Design a protein with these regions (language model features):
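Hinge/lid segment of periplasmic solute-binding proteins
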Residues: 97-153, 192-197, 209-214, 219-221, ...
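Extracytoplasmic/periplasmic substrate-binding proteins
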Residues: 41, 53-54, 100-102, 211-215, ...
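Extracytoplasmic "Venus flytrap"/periplasmic binding protein-like
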Residues: 53-129, 162-165, 172, 269-270, ...
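Conserved C-terminal helix/tail region of periplasmic/extracytoplasmic solute-binding proteins
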Residues: 65-66, 162, 390-447
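Short, low-complexity disordered leader/linker segments with a strong preference
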Residues: 1-37, 60-61, 116, 434, ...
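Short, solvent-exposed loop/beta-turn-alpha elements that line the ligand-binding surface or hinge
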Residues: 110-126, 197-203, 220-241, 291-305, ...
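Helix-loop-helix "hinge/cap" segment bordering the ligand-binding cleft or interdomain interface
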Residues: 56, 63, 116-117, 136-212, ...
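Long, aromatic- and glycine/proline-rich binding clefts that accommodate carbohydrate-like moieties
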Residues: 126-136, 304-311, 357-409, 413
Length: 447
């Protein structure tokens, strides 16, 4: 699942498709039966079946039937905007967290009342960073409820560390992380007959470009937009410093240059097969490594027998990771909005959150769900639990959907500088960031 899941989720973010789409709703049921049309993305190997199983207790108790439509990733943006403008919408839909503000700006989403939010425990019941994306920043209105969360950590081959005489604790800061990579490189690792590179990262062809680079920008003290959201600050010295550190790991040979042609799924497969000792990914990789091949997992892979997870190494401004995920929203022109709200309340409840996290490999958006032993007692999952509380997301503004592709393209060009020449020129990095700033501010000025 992981191989197609998160990559797909991030693809949607990058190609204007983190939303949902599908066929027209048909709110027809038996006599007196309430049918809620719900559009979702394939969040698991069996997306419709998994949600149908999750909803069985709800349907039995309420008599509300939920009709699930799983929507393809690529055409999401055009389909949802067409649906929103035509009125041919479902009652309820899954929205990628960074797109809630854009669809809210179109006037397509129903505001969720404070009374309903209070019935779900209030905003304090949800992971703070996920609540930041439940409406347009500064509007005071909520148009979506967090459903699940995605954060990232560092997956590590423990046997590789042992052979290179490196401890997990030595991966805790930028400097010690870099020194550890050198030790792994100098060890000239070969495990089970497989040569092993110290680190695996994806390059500009990946859907994760901005999500992979953002933590290093943030940890160096950089950012994308000013606090008032009126200007772009990506060209700061701090941003350059963060990018130079991360790109430098490849330039120094700790990442094979051919990895820069790979996407996240391919790097993940390399880690699982033993081709690299470390790489950054989300909690769904734990599900992959603990699930049998017959169910799409890799539980018999070399990595499955010898892995642990730790957080990002701390930078000058601390440890920060990117946090994404999805929310649930009701469409204004939906036919069963009251029933759709009841579905949201159920899916946002503690046990439903735990059950869906187990089915998908994602993280719950509800804070109390993390108290379940599945997260609290598993040291690897606990790393991701911690990450959602120190992580960040992007500004929840309607124009972010236009800004992200610009930033992705400009940041992707950085990898060309890694492949060309002997040294990475900070001036060239800054030039690209200045171009990004100009393009972003052109969009911001049109608000």
């Amino acid at each position: 699942v992981k191989k197609t899941l998160i990559p797909s989720l991030v693809i949607v973010l990058l190609v204007f498709g983190v939303l949902i789409s599908g066929c027209a709703p048909t709110n027809k049921g038996g006599a007196g039966e309430k049918v809620v049309e719900m559009w979702v993305m394939p969040n698991s190997l069996n997306p419709i079946t998994d949600i149908e199983e999750l909803l069985k207790p709800f349907e039995a108790k309420t008599g509300i039937k939920v009709k699930i439509t799983s929507v393809d990733w690529g055409a999401g943006w055009s389909k949802i905007t067409t649906a929103a403008t035509s009125g041919d919408v479902p009652d309820l839909g899954q929205l990628g967290s960074t797109w809630v503000s854009a669809i809210t700006g179109m006037g397509a989403l129903e505001e969720i009342s404070q009374e309903a939010i209070a019935q779900m425990g209030g905003k304090a019941a949800f992971v703070p960073v996920s609540w930041q994306t439940t409406g347009t920043e500064g509007s005071g209105k909520t148009t979506a409820i967090p459903w699940f969360v995605d954060a990232r950590g560092l997956f590590v081959r423990t046997d590789a560390l042992k052979k290179a005489k490196v401890s997990v604790g030595e991966l805790a800061s930028w400097d010690s992380f870099k020194n550890s990579l050198k030790k792994l490189y100098d060890a000239d690792l070969v495990l089970d007959g497989q040569p092993m590179a110290p680190l695996g990262v994806s390059g500009k062809n990946d859907w994760n470009v901005i999500h992979s680079l953002a933590p290093w920008i943030w940890m160096a003290g950089g950012d994308f937009l000013s606090a008032d959201r009126k200007s772009c600050v990506i060209d700061s010295e701090e941003s350059v410093k963060g990018l130079m550190f991360y790109l430098g790991l490849v330039k120094e040979g700790y990442v094979p240059s051919e990895y820069l042609e790979l996407n996240t799924a391919q790097v993940s497969a390399n880690f699982n097969s033993g081709a690299c000792a470390m790489y950054f990914d989300g909690p769904y990789e734990i599900k992959t490594l603990t699930r049998p091949e017959s169910e799409g997992g890799a539980s018999t892979s070399p990595a499955a027998k010898n892995f642990t997870v730790t957080g990002y190494p701390k930078g000058p401004k601390g440890r920060i990771t990117f946090v994404g995920g999805s929310s649930l929203a009701i469409f204004k022109q939906g036919k069963n909005k009251a029933a759709a709200l009841e579905v949201i309340k159920y899916l946002a409840s503690k046990q439903a959150q735990i059950n869906y996290a187990k089915a998908t490999g994602f993280l719950p958006a509800r804070v109390e769900a993390f108290n379940d032993p599945f997260f609290a007692k598993d040291p690897n999952r606990k790393v991701f639990k911690d990450a959602v509380f120190y992580g960040r997301t992007y500004p929840s503004i309607p124009t972010w959907g236009l800004l992200e592709p610009i930033l992705t393209r400009r940041l992707g060009i950085m990898w060309d500088y890694v492949l060309g020449g002997k040294e990475i020129d900070p001036a060239k990095i800054k030039d690209q960031l200045k171009l990004a700033k100009q393009e972003v501010e052109t969009i911001l000025s049109q608000k």
